[in-house]
């Protein structure tokens, strides 16, 4: 499963094509951009949502119908949907994004990670990708030294 899908917090995945080189993947992606949105609603992604296998199968069929004929041979009609599971103990009912630029110290009980986000017990979430280059220290107050 591509890291990109995990970064976006996908709960289900279905590989629809396999190509011998990257340029073909780009051509398929350009065709599919016309019918599929390429934006992730980060708030919705941080909720517990079960995978929708039927929706993935229907999306594969839409892709098949809209893909240019010369790209059709690369489609994989028999792949089965995969479930992606993240290490999250619980999902808070309400979430609030926190930034290390505005709040340089973040503390609290970590419930898990999903996609690019760390999820804290109080509903705060931290987008790790937005903080590339930051130096952070992680401490466990219960650790015995």
Language-model regions, residue ranges each:
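Short aromatic-glycine-enriched beta-strand elements
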Residues: 116-120
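GIY-YIG-like beta-to-alpha core
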Residues: 1-11
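Short glycine-rich, low-complexity segments
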Residues: 11-105, 112, 124-145
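OB-fold and OB-like beta-barrel modules that bind single-stranded nucleic acids
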Residues: 1, 108-110
């Amino acid at each position: 499963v591509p890291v990109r899908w995990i970064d976006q917090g996908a709960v289900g995945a279905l590989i629809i094509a396999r190509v011998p080189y990257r340029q073909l993947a780009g051509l398929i992606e350009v065709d599919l951009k016309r019918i599929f949105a390429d934006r992730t609603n980060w708030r919705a992604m941080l909720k517990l949502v079960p995978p929708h296998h039927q929706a993935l199968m229907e999306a594969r069929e839409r892709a098949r119908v809209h893909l240019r004929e010369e790209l059709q041979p690369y489609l994989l009609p028999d792949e089965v949907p995969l479930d992606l599971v993240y290490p999250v103990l619980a999902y808070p009912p309400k979430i609030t994004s926190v930034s290390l630029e505005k709040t340089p110290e973040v503390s609290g009980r970590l419930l898990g990670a999903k996609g690019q986000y760390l999820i804290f017990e109080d509903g705060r979430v931290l987008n790790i990708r937005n903080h590339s280059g930051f130096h952070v220290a992680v401490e466990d107050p219960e650790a015995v030294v």
